[in-house]
Amino acid sequence: MTLLAFVAETEIEHQILKARGGALSGDALLRRMADADLFIPSTGEVQTDGSGFSPVLVDQGGAPFVAVFTAMSRQPKDMAPYMMQMNGRQFFRRLPAGYGVMVNPGYDAQILVPPHGMAAFKQDHARPVAGTSDPG
């Protein structure tokens, strides 16, 4: 499969390129993604209350990964007929245990966060930030 060239369109995508070049750690990138808007393809029509949402799952080594994009324009038209926009932090918190995240699938800068990586990230975000009552 030929991967598409990745040219940054959004601030978080510039951060992805920094991480790819080694100027930003994977953990720091995930923290920045938590503050960014993500675009999640859905095979079902998403209602205002979130019902109908059915994310696109990609199998990687027997583990399910939810496909997400960092810009609305990145989703291939034939991947899913619908899309839900959500803040990364909200998405990560709602991601069920046992699921990983595939960011920008099909691009040469795609990112795979395995299920155990998402579990560790979510656990870190469950702890309050020093000096605040905010968990992250």
Describe the residue ranges of each PLM region:
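An interfacial alpha-helical scaffold signature
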Residues: M1-G136
